[in-house]
């Protein structure tokens, strides 16, 4: 998976889970996280039942920072832990060189490697699309640009909701 933002992490979780998400089944969730719901163990904790993925997944980002550093402060560690437990390989500072029959060629630091992949998922960000806005604005229509159409980098739902609310109140 090229791109380790929120969408890249969500796709990695989806691709590495077997069956329905454990978040839909309280007993499966408790087992995955080592929660002893019967309190047979001290502190109500037991050994987590990790389920490695049947797929080999690489999660790459171009930034040198910690993979997933831009995820939510209160949930980022959860997403990183789930993927780590499923055997996902995190690669930061990746320079994408090419894709061929051998796989994805990347350079990390001074070394180059080929990741032997048969499928590549692009979660590499988005570009704002302002074409319609420009046409409507030039025509004199009362239009506003908000959310990802305004700033697509690191989409921020709170910012988009705030902007949408402000526009709605002003109408």
Regions found by a protein language model. Give the residues of each.
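Beta1/beta-strand and adjacent pyrophosphate-binding region of the FAD-binding site
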Residues: 1-7
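Short, well-ordered coil/turn residues at beta-beta hairpins
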Residues: 2, 117, 123-124, 147, ...
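Residue-level signal for short, function-critical loop segments
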Residues: 5, 63, 149
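Ferredoxin-type iron-sulfur electron-transfer modules and their immediate structural context
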Residues: 6, 126, 134, 158, ...
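A Rossmann-like FAD-binding core segment of flavoenzymes
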Residues: 9-131
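Internal hydrophobic alpha-helix adjacent to the cofactor/substrate pocket in enzyme cavities
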Residues: 12-27, 59, 139-146, 158-171
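FAD-binding beta-loop-beta segment adjacent to the flavin cofactor pocket
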Residues: 126-144, 149-155
């Amino acid at each position: 998976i090229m791109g380790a933002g929120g969408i890249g992490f969500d796709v990695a979780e989806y691709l590495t889970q077997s069956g329905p998400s454990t978040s839909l089944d309280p007993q499966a969730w408790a087992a995955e996280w080592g929660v002893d719901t019967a309190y047979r163990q001290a502190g109500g904790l037991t050994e987590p039942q990790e389920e490695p993925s049947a797929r080999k997944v690489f999660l790459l980002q171009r930034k040198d920072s910690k993979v997933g550093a831009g995820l939510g402060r209160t949930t980022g560690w959860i997403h990183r832990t789930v993927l780590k437990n499923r055997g996902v390989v995190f690669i930061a500072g990746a320079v994408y060189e090419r894709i061929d029959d051998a796989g994805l060629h990347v350079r990390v630091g001074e070394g180059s490697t080929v990741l032997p992949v048969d499928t590549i998922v692009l979660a590499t960000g988005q570009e704002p699309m302002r074409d319609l806005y420009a046409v409507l604005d030039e025509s004199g229509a009362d239009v506003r640009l908000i959310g990802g159409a305004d700033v697509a980098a690191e989409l921020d739902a709170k910012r988009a909701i705030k902007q949408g609310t402000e526009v709605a109140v002003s109408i």
